[in-house]
Curated annotation (Swiss-Prot):
It comes from Escherichia coli O6:H1 (strain CFT073 / ATCC 700928 / UPEC). This is Glucosamine-6-phosphate deaminase. GO terms for cellular component: cytosol. PROSITE patterns: GLC_GALNAC_ISOMERASE (PS01161). The keyword Glycoprotein does not apply. Transmembrane segments: none annotated. Homohexamer; trimer of disulfide-linked dimers. The active site is at D72 (proton acceptor), D141 (for ring-opening step), H143 (proton acceptor), E148 (for ring-opening step). Catalyzes the reversible isomerization-deamination of glucosamine 6-phosphate (GlcN6P) to form fructose 6-phosphate (Fru6P) and ammonium ion. Keywords: Allosteric enzyme, Carbohydrate metabolism, Disulfide bond, Hydrolase. Allosterically activated by N-acetylglucosamine 6-phosphate (GlcNAc6P). Its EC number is 3.5.99.6.
Length: 266
């Protein structure tokens, strides 16, 4: 596992965007051989999306031959609702870059057959071979996507019940009214994430410090689903300074030394 210790959320966003752009450009995608990118929503990736849009407008990257799969979507929320992940992704990213509409894959939380929707999503991912880079965030309780504590580490795309804590955390997007936050969501599974060639998790804020500690210094434990990344051959944690407050000093010093050359120029 790599840990990229930065100072601010803005630096995390810039580093992550630069990494994505470098991966896409090195891959040299074509219509027949697209780069497959997994994407999250929420507050954490906002600076990354902003930086990606800026880099696209500067001519540093094209998304014409990029295929995307989003991590999750609320169940029962109309896709036109401003807080649906369909709306979020178009508002903050898709509408500002040159990605073709047919290359965008989002779970349908209003599908008449939820099990079939989840199964078809997995099948479509497999049809591309694999996701080359999956970017994500992490919840205060260590959940990735909507794989809440005690999720199976072999799980696939499915419907999940959201914990009260997750709904409270997300209520900031719903006028701070937890009753407006859906109780269920469709989410890729832990196993789906582990199938990706590379997984990059962004970690921001002191409230995520225990989750980061569990991921880096703890044992693999389904109560902290983020810890599954210890099993992944190519996992990256990109974090700001407040999120590292629970790590041991020697742990942080170790990663600072390892990544010194990779965190310059931000």
């Amino acid at each position: 596992m790599r840990l990229i210790p930065l100072t601010t959320a803005e630096q995390v966003g810039k580093w992550a965007a630069r990494h994505i752009v470098n991966r896409i450009n090195a891959f040299k995608p074509t219509a027949d051989r697209p780069f497959v990118l997994g994407l999250p929503t929420g507050g954490t990736p906002m600076t990354t999306y902003k930086a990606l849009v800026e880099m696209h407008k500067a001519g540093q990257v094209s998304f014409k031959h990029v295929v995307t799969f989003n991590m999750d979507e609320y169940v029962g929320l109309p896709k036109e609702h401003p807080e649906s992940y369909y709306s979020f992704m178009h508002r903050n990213f898709f509408d500002h870059v040159d990605i073709p509409a047919e290359n965008i894959n989002l779970l349908n939380g209003n599908a008449p057959d939820i099990e079939a929707e989840c199964r078809q999503y997995e099948e479509k991912i497999r049809s591309y071979g694999k996701i080359h880079l999956f970017m994500g965030g992490v919840g205060n309780d260590g959940h990735i996507a909507f794989n809440e504590p005690a999720s199976s580490l072999a799980s696939r795309t499915r419907i999940k019940t959201l914990t009260h804590d997750t709904r409270v955390a997300n209520s900031r997007f719903f006028d701070n009214d937890v009753n407006q936050v859906p109780k269920y969501a469709l989410t890729v599974g832990v196993g789906t994430l582990l199938d990706a060639e590379e997984v990059m998790i962004l970690v921001l804020g002191s409230q995520k410090a225990l989750a980061l500690q569990a991921a880096v210094e703890g044992c693999v434990n389904h109560m902290w689903t983020i810890s599954c990344l210890q099993l992944h051959p190519k996992a990256i944690m990109v974090c700001d300074e407040p999120s590292t407050m629970e790590l041991k000093v020697k742990t942080l010093r170790y990663f600072n030394e390892l990544e010194a050359e990779n965190i310059k120029g931000l």
